[in-house]
Amino acid sequence: ARNRCVEDVYEPGSTFKPVTALAGLRAGLIRPADTFYDDGIYEVSGCGDSESCFFQNADAEGTGSVNLQSSLTLSSDWYYYWIGDNLWAERERLGDDFLQQTATEFGFTADTGIDLASEREGFAFTPAQVRQLNEDYPEDFPYGDWTTGNTINMSIGQGDLGVTPLQLTNAYAAIANGGTLF
């Protein structure tokens, strides 16, 4: 029988938002009490008027004024789009894989070490890995250039990111226990 807990990799979606929040805190982009106004539609800074310059919450509904705590409670995609956009904008200072490094610290890119057969590693692709995948497998990975949109998607747990249910459980256990990843 298939053990989906360790053999299957899924996009974590909004359950990834605490990882993005920590990256934003560490980068100095946000403080817990900083408030932003979430009107439901996020416009990528300096992007223009293209359709790819806009990201929206579910149903394009805004959550109003949000800080770190309420952004998690209300699951404001807008708040995390802003963090992702600014992590990418600050890539010269932070590196172009700052969010992925934070995901790695939570154990998302390695197996957990549990003694179960067929455990898979999750992934949080970096710009360099996406370029390499494009070079090696151009039909499967036709886009080799990382953009702001890749980081924005990853900031809400979508896109170039996959985790096993056990990895996600371990990450949340580390949050709950003060930071120890087992």
In which residue ranges do the predicted regions lie?
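Beta-lactam-recognizing serine transpeptidase/beta-lactamase-like catalytic domain environment
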Residues: 1-14, 19-182
